[in-house]
Amino acid sequence: MRRSLAPSQRLGVRLQPNQEFTPPLLQKKNKRTCQQEQEQLQCQFALRDATNSNGSIPLPIRFTANSEYELAIAKVLARKFKVPIANYVPDYGGNRCLGVRRSIVRRALHDPQACNALVLYTPPVYSEHERMKMDPTKILVHVVVDPLLSNILRPHQREGVRFMYDCVEGKKGNFNGCIMADEMGLGKTLQCVTLVWTLLRQSCECKPTITKAIIVSPSSLVKNWEKEFTKWLHGRMHCLAMEGGSKEDTIKALEQFSMNTSTRLGTPVLLISYETFRIYANILCQNEVGMVICDEGHRLKNSDNLTYQALMGLKTKRRVLLSGTPIQNDLTEYFSLVNFVNPEMLGTAADFKRNFENPILKGQNTDSSDKERERALEKTQELIGLVNQCIIRRTNQILTKYLPVKFEMVICVRLTSVQLEFYTNFLKSDKVRRSLADCNEKASLTALADITTLKKLCSHPDLIYEKMLARDKGFENSQNILPTNYKPKDLNPELSGKFMLLDFMLATIRANSDDKVVLISNYTQTLDLFEQLARKRKYTFVRLDGTMTIKKRSKVVDRFNDPENDCFLFMLSSKAGGCGLNLIGANRLFMFDPDWNPANDEQAMARVWRDGQKKPCYIYRLVASGSIEEKILQRQTHKKSLSSTIIDNNESAEKHFTRDDLKDLFSFDSKILSDTHEKLKCKRCLQNVQTKPPPEDTDCTSHLSQWFHCSNNRGLPDDILAQAWTASKCVSFVFHHRSQAQAIKESEETKQEAEDTSIPAKSKRKRSTTPESDDCNDEDFKGF
């Protein structure tokens, strides 16, 4: 306080030494007033004492009862509260300290009798006499999925959650792991979120089953997992997502997660990439973990790689592996996946190969004997009986209940005269012939390079222009094949049959509809040509490949999926965005070149026909007629037949190709309409003209022999392709089929607009995830 504001200064009073200061602001009470207040208090005390002497309830202090009425009111107000329960004895805590929990009846976290409740465990029914004898702390309760999740799960997802819970809790046998092998788009992520949330929150013993879990995924999907947990749980749980950051921060966060054993862990779920887990496995493998989930689990197909071995060192018995394609190349890879989740279920690798793999593969060939086929069938059934205990698989036929119809087409495109001359000269080259003669069971790196060269040539001569200039192997005498007006940096679609067809179809789509298109290739060089074509025709586009950062990918996908955005093309590297990416903003997809691994193509082609799609979808697979691309397609058919036999339990999977057929990669017939159709030996076609339709119970998941076969543009389900066939004159043959009938009924407004404009109406949809890293090598090539 300032001295000028002090009372002594304001009042002008000077204090003498040893004189007490009297505040001038307090009013002095006179003696008469004080005496009156004391008399009133004495009267009140006397009244209270008088009532107490009669055994009645004491009146409130300072309450003056001037009449019987006022006295009655005073007695009511002074009465203590009494709990309206018969024979109730109040408990005021006694000698218990704060924080001591009262003994309560054990019960489930959620009501098992509620509507739409998903009960994962039902305890035994006890009689009242048994309950009296039992320890109250040992009574088991129901395990019920949180209604927040159970109310949004579809029937097949409820079944999947129940299956995984039974497996990880050891209720299906002497194992605690499982493989969720549902095909793309069936909601594997949501099912895992439900499982993790349930195990972290409850058990039949009224406590959490696990205290923490680790989810390992490709680096580009770490952020997507975090978004899924936030989306479905509405922020009720936080995850520790390891993406970016310094080495010191990463080590500190992982050590804290690994060492913490509290049931109240702030971030009980660790989201980490395969690469990061491998680097810091020494930290994460020190302490026990409740459960581990491996997304895109087919990355663990090789039991010898460091990532597989690092994950096997994790101290946990509960292992869940997610993969829509457990069998990609051979049964050895399948064994690695099963052995990861449940070690020793199938024995050692040598035992598995001797007891299962060799007999089954022998029976797959068309030239196998009846005895070999019978033994293969026995071993197949035995293997199925074992793995069915820990694997669940549903096909995307389930999606037909929720998604519009999908048309899938395999289009055989003729090579142009320039491509044809390049192709034949390459095969006639002495250097190429010598390298092929040296190939054994395992193809040499030289042969693999030759295969890659032919694949690029089938797409466009621009992709092999540098090899031609360098007079590389196979192009020693090919300098004069290109036209005189050829410009390497100016795309000419007329030099490639597939680019001519693509050019005509894109122009027709752009002129006659508001559909968006996804262009997918295994090579970033092909994406460069897509860009040149888009700029040439002034199409708006976005591009996603391995050079794009993960943060930018999500923005690009959101921009394309926005129905208000006019972006026409989405160019995608199959290795960068083939897994987990949602592109439901488009309903037409071109798979420009095939991959050795059918799983990669299946993953890439599933980007548009996904949950949230409202328009009919058209999938186009382009292959060069009679070329090495058709041979790759045939190899895919062989692998898919193996997968359908083991995974889908399809005993009648047809066997159309021998191994000798698959070795004939470098043969070429320029006059054939479709080498694949010829080798199918189709009984429904006469001179390449279909005379009998496929069976009614087939769809686009059936074998190519059970698809529609067209050698002309009649009967095609897509007018865009029919017009381009006539205009480009480069299509030789088409296989096509559709999914089951559309289950979602369009509104009357949508139907009317479709009738008026022949264009499916736009629907608002916006959903995104992130993709995998880019890799243009043919890593799944296994030799011939």
From Swiss-Prot:
Catalytic activity, EC: 3.6.4.-
Cellular compartments annotated: Nucleus
Keywords annotated in UniProt: ATP-binding, Cell cycle, Cell division, DNA damage, DNA repair, DNA-binding, Helicase, Hydrolase, Meiosis, Mitosis, Nucleotide-binding, Nucleus, Phosphoprotein
An annotated GO cellular component: nucleus
Cited SUPFAM superfamilies: P-loop containing nucleoside triphosphate hydrolases
InterPro entries linked: Helicase_ATP-bd, Helicase_C-like, P-loop_NTPase, Rad54_N, SNF2-like_sf, SNF2/RAD54-like_C, SNF2_N, SNF2_RAD54_helicase_repair
GO biological process terms, semicolon-separated: cell division; chromatin remodeling; DNA synthesis involved in double-strand break repair via homologous recombination; double-strand break repair via homologous recombination; double-strand break repair via synthesis-dependent strand annealing; meiotic DNA repair synthesis; oocyte fate determination; oogenesis
Function: Involved in mitotic DNA repair and meiotic recombination. Functions in the recombinational DNA repair pathway. Essential for interhomolog gene conversion (GC), but may have a less important role in intersister GC than spn-A/Rad51. In the presence of DNA, spn-A/Rad51 enhances the ATPase activity of okr/Rad54.
Protein name: DNA repair and recombination protein RAD54-like
Broad class of where this protein is predominantly found: nucleus
Protein encoded by which gene: okr
Coiled-coil annotated residue ranges, if any: none
Ranges of residues in domain Helicase C-terminal: 501-658
Native organism: Drosophila willistoni
Phosphothreonine: residues carrying this PTM: T22
Family per similarity comment: Belongs to the SNF2/RAD54 helicase family.
Amino acids binding ATP: D182, E183, M184, G185, L186, G187, K188, T189
